[in-house]
């Protein structure tokens, strides 16, 4: 597995070629204003990364708000370009990561807790509360941390069912079951 970080820049900040007037607006992200409405019915991530907020180019930082309705999960995933620092602002969350020796480090977070997920390691968050939502804010040590969702990576990319069945020591019928739920909707 290759792990990389953002390169250092030689200027205070990087202005995209299509931006001619640099003022406070360039350094302001307004995409999280929508969070002030109702709560979503499915797990939702609102990101402020390089794609959404070009001022982050070269700054080695990004941000995400994670909204967990009752009983929802952010499935096992990795961020190959950054570590993650998660701050819980509402509810409770089960969180954890698995290191390169296959050891699970997990914790039940309460409001105000901060948890660190090391760069490139598989991790998850789960709101096991059946009544109340949870909200967390994550920061990343990269303007473009990228996310690799393991369920999608394994079951929607065309990896041969025989390879998956042998890898999971199961049969092809068992491998096909999660593919149905993960298939893109028309």
PLM regions and their residue ranges:
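Short acidic-glycine-tyrosine-enriched beta hairpin
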Residues: 56-58, 99-120
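Double-stranded beta-helix
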Residues: 11-12, 103, 107, 116, ...
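Structural recognition of the beta-strand scaffold that forms the well-ordered cores
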Residues: 64-67, 85-88, 94-96, 115-117, ...
